[in-house]
Amino acid sequence: MCKRIFRPAGGQQRRWIGALAASAALAFGAFTGTAVAQENYRFAIANDLSGPSSFHGKTFAAGFNIYLREVNDAGGVNGKKVELLQENAARDVQKELGFLRKFAQQDNALAAMIVTTDGLFAAKPLMESIKVPLMAIGVPELASNPPHPWVFNIFASYQDTVFAAIDYVFNSIGDKDPKIGVVYPDGQFGLEGLRATELRMQKYRKPVAAKVVMGFRETDATTQMLALKQASVKYVIVHHGGSWIAAILRDAAKVGLEATFFGTTQAMDREPDLILSQPGGQNLAKNFIGVGPWSKWNESSIPGVAVMRAAVKKHEKIEDAKLGDVMYGNFVQGHVNAMVLVEALRKAGPNPTGEKLRDAMSRLRNFDTKGITPPISFGPDRRKGFSAVKLYRINAERKVYEPIGGWVVVK
């Protein structure tokens, strides 16, 4: 791997992530110097490589860059290579905002990405001056509703996953008077899950039976599970990450809470190993249903997933049995994000700018990911690519998530 770390004006180290470097290293490393980089098209991300959500950031970057390597191997776009510049914001909102300005003003990035929901909300008022399209690993509904000219949700939102889970309880399970609770962390990410739960329960004219907070630094959920048990909750919306899901299922069993737990998008950021490794893990897995807006790496019958798997095997030199070691977490999300940005770049013409790329994204209609997601469409008043999700159960024997059915359109 060609790696060069250099100091720009001001003495701050920065790392260039080239699409020709190995994708595992791309989550951490660097690519090239200024002269070469100026000849390439550039996207940029204020990522988390060392903070509490570094798991998301590293896997997202790996998936993004596998797709760029495929694009560059085929000749790039307009004869130029496409690369990803990555800075480590370590889940710090102020650093994310600072890097966004840098991407536009110093690095000539054509589009930018950040990690946090809080950062996305803080950045929205700044984008008219920064003037590059903005996306995030977090996918809150409020990022795209109401629509903002520069902010895009490529995927169905956290709200969509919550709505689908509650609809499943009422319409598929058939419980017309369910006691539903919600577990969420503090901050904007958590509030998105709480708001969505309250809003969907209002549709069915039922109250939320219990609302409990589990912070990002908490590793024990006993107190929260006791509160849910006291409220006689039978279904729980868990708007959190995968490691917290494992703790919640473990401690629910410990206190005797018998319930079905619905995990939203980031709840499946780990493979089921964390759940299955808990005491009685196979039984815990039976109580979990995941809800997410992109297909899983193991759904190999889906054409787009098959192509993605082949690309990973080619560039990582691994066999089928090891694909899960690379394509877990937010890998698929990063891969699809790159697909959308490259398609917009192709439509933006030979001299793209942030504004031209934004307008090209706005013109995308029914962009086909070959089944990794539903078709993706944007418009002047539409900044969310689709509103459909899948529900997943854990196959304990294979240690993978498997879909219960097809795409469920959320209305």
Language model features: what each stretch is:
Residues 1-14:
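N-terminal secretory signal peptides that target proteins for export/translocation
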Residues 44-65, 87-94, 116, 183-191, ...:
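Extracytoplasmic "Venus flytrap"
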Residues 40, 55-62, 74-145, 154, ...:
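Beta-alpha junction/loop-to-helix N-cap segments that form part of ligand/metal-binding clefts
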